[in-house]
């Protein structure tokens, strides 16, 4: 029997005529090879989720069309000289609306691990660092069949933070003890050259940036902005001179969880001064505390227009 000869159960009327917001597939893994001029290609194995809405007049979606659309778009991307994961998602949501003619809304998300090659700060040993990248896209179809697309690219990066509050307490305590046997001038000279202890956190910074379909954002830029927002980047391979450099630098740049989010805001505004005002960004920082059982959290969600207004104040 051909496909057309089998009954199409999905097209039947549902017994309960209620529309559904999202129906689709999750956890579809694909290999993507991103070509780079004069460089080795980047290999990603992202996991895709893909959904469409379902009207109240239809029993079910044609589920096989979703993984079929994912395979088609990924295969087409393999022949392109430059491709971004968020553009794959943007193309995918448009393809989903083509395949599901009854749908008015399509949404997809892709998550994967992105490997960055770097050198340790002093010994210059080669190391690979893993970051998580997230891409999403949403497509809407109006009454005339016109499709509009918004896409999002994001990164989640691990770094190190140092608590400013505890460090100031340690400095004050050290100063009081030094003044017991040193004069004020000598004590200040000691304080000026000593790096004071504090408690540390493993920080996890996230930027999710939503932009129009024709606007491109480099995920490497987002990764650097997140790294620079914390007290120090981290590195997988560290010899003792490397450890000393990272720990010293981090303690010379203490930041609260709130500071990290604000630093990311400034980094984005400086790197992308021409992004449209309606571009929406979500910035999150989670610091995994070393002296508490809880973690510290801060977040900012705003349009670029709003961020520009606040930064002028």
Curated annotation (Swiss-Prot):
Q: Where is the signal peptide?
A: none
Could you tell me which Pfam families the record lists for this protein? GCHY-1 (PF02649)
Q: Keywords assigned by UniProt?
A: Hydrolase, Iron, Metal-binding
The cofactor named in the record is: Fe(2+)
Q: Which GO terms describe its molecular function?
A: GTP cyclohydrolase I activity; GTP cyclohydrolase IV activity; iron ion binding
Q: Please cite one Gene Ontology biological process associated with this protein.
A: tetrahydromethanopterin biosynthetic process
Cross-referenced InterPro entries, in alphabetical order? GTP_cyclohydrolase_FolE2/MptA (IPR003801), GTP_cyclohydrolase_MptA (IPR022840)
Give the metabolic or biological pathway: Cofactor biosynthesis; 5,6,7,8-tetrahydromethanopterin biosynthesis
EC number(s) stated in the UniProt entry for this protein? 3.5.4.39
- Catalysed reaction, written as an equation: GTP + H2O = 7,8-dihydroneopterin 2',3'-cyclic phosphate + formate + diphosphate + H(+)
Question: What does the entry comment about cofactor binding?
Answer: Binds 1 Fe(2+) ion per subunit.
Could you tell me which HAMAP family the record lists for this protein?
GTP_cyclohydrol_A
Q: Which PANTHER family match?
A: GTP CYCLOHYDROLASE MPTA
Protein name in the entry = GTP cyclohydrolase MptA
Q: Which organism is it from?
A: Methanosphaera stadtmanae (strain ATCC 43021 / DSM 3091 / JCM 11832 / MCB-3)
Q: Which gene encodes it?
A: mptA
